[in-house]
């Protein structure tokens, strides 16, 4: 992968900055307005868009959740560990993971150089 793109994707996001400053959990309001953890496409997609590519949030455990859309994860560099329907899945550079709306996913903390997009 082109190093300029990797540098761009590796930049610390506002959410990651809060995590690094001591907030040791994700902010559910960034992902859903429901009590149960169903990641809502309306919270992530720009108005009028049907697809959005964003860097995976690193440095924090992402608790078990589902999505109201199909999620595609591409591992650009490093590794990430996912628990999908109770099974451990380790993504390495170049891997793709497709998750339907019924898949229950949990993500273990990723490091600074573990770069994925979803």
Could you tell me what each predicted segment is?
Residues 49-118:
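N-terminal regulatory/effector-sensing and dimerization cores
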Residues 1-79:
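Generic protein-terminus/edge-of-domain signal
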């Amino acid at each position: 992968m082109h190093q300029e793109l990797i540098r761009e994707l590796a930049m610390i996001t506002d959410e990651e900055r809060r995590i690094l400053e001591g907030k040791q959990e994700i902010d559910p309001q960034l992902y859903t307005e429901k009590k149960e953890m169903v990641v809502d496409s309306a919270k992530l997609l720009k108005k009028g868009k049907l697809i959005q590519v964003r860097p995976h949030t690193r440095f924090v455990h992402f608790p078990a959740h589902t999505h109201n859309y199909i999620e595609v994860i591409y591992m650009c560099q490093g590794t990430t560990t996912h628990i999908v329907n109770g099974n451990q899945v380790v993504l390495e550079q170049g891997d793709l993971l497709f998750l339907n709306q019924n898949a229950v996913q949990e993500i273990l903390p990723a490091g600074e150089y573990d770069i994925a997009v979803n």
